[in-house]
Amino acid sequence: MRWYAVDDLSAEETARLAQALRDMEFSSGMTGLYWLPVPEAMLSPVQREHAADCGPYALGLELEEHSLRLELLVRARGRLRCDCVRYAGPELRAHMIAYLDQLLTDLQIAG
């Protein structure tokens, strides 16, 4: 599995991030797991084609007491296995990492 990880976070920082993710309605229903939505404009042609049946698409963000991991696999929330489930390409990967880094900056989380 490919990940983008940030560690050495304080428990207070991860609690603040968890609250922000809940406020944005990114909760998954599982403790410590959040879904970061993939912008529609950045979906692959196959993902656009499958969006009605397999979407929405998201990257999983796993939040632990002192770290976070952004999974770089684009998951189809409507289906577990499909050709549209694939690793983020370079542009999407860079966008999602920058998005997460900006969120951490906005929350004054150094990481």
Enumerate the language-model features and the residues they cover.
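Ser/Thr-rich, low-complexity intrinsically disordered terminal regions
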Residues: 16, 20-58
